[in-house]
Amino acid sequence: MAAITQATVEKPIHYPEKLIDTVLTRLPLAEGCHVVDAVYVLYRCLQQTDHHRADIEEYCCELLAMIREHHKPDGGFSYYMGYSQPHYHRVHITYHHPVSDLHGTLLLTWAAAMIRHILGYHDWRIIKP
């Protein structure tokens, strides 16, 4: 996953405005990695520029609605909308059940924390997974 790989590097982002413009062209697929990758790019780019901040905040509100669709009654999140992640790096780990899973919960909680920060709520500490 590109976001986690980049999370370990604390170097300036090249062309943050162009990256923001690219991310804002469409919503990501409603899958854990795609959602967190989009949010992470915006989160990191906003540390260098306020380019399209209002558009980013609106986009993040749409992402929060998408993340809510992954929420399950047990409090966790499913990686896919409606069901758990059956494979991880081509290894079968479970079946398509309508339950939360660890990977989805980690990624979507991290995405929600970054979105809260983007929206001006700094009550959650952003960590690197």
What does each of the following model-derived ranges do?
Residues 30-36:
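Alpha-solenoid helical repeat architecture
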